[in-house]
Design a protein with these regions (language model features):
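Glycine-rich beta-strand-turn "strand-cap" elements at beta-sheet edges
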Residues: 1-10, 45-61, 84-113
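Short, well-ordered beta-strand segments in beta-rich or mixed alpha/beta enzyme
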Residues: 12-18, 48-80
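An amphipathic, aromatic/His-enriched active-site/gating alpha helix that lines ligand/cofactor pockets
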Residues: 30, 34-46, 65-101
């Protein structure tokens, strides 16, 4: 059953997307896990990392969950849509993303036990 979400878990999320060539994806994933995910684990309510291997490139998506936009702004130093590029992102990514997407969560359905 879908229920309106009212702050029990999280209210907002930031979505970052980055693409690598397929031949670089296996090197980028552990780098992203080691350098990009820990700051989110420390500051956000939660974080997820996704990977989709396509024919010629791989897309990585990071979703981090936040109580509100102010918490995101505190993490980024002002603009909640600002990206924290990792030192080696330029080496790995097909193009450097300019912004993250910030969205408000309207419905949350969690798996049943």
């Amino acid at each position: 059953m879908n229920r309106p979400h009212r702050g029990a878990l999280h209210e907002r999320h930031r979505i970052w997307r980055g693409r690598t060539r397929r031949d670089l994806a296996d090197a980028y994933e552990p780098y992203l896990r080691r350098e990009g995910i820990p700051p989110l684990q420390e500051k956000a309510l939660g974080v997820q990392l996704f990977r989709e291997d396509r024919e010629e490139e791989t897309e990585f998506v990071t979703i981090s969950y936040w109580p509100d936009v102010d918490a995101m702004a505190s993490f980024t130093g002002g603009d909640p849509r600002k990206i924290h590029h990792l030192p080696r992102d330029e080496e790995f990514l097909v193009e450097l993303p300019e912004r993250v997407t910030v969205m408000r969560i309207l419905v949350t359905q969690l798996p049943r036990d």
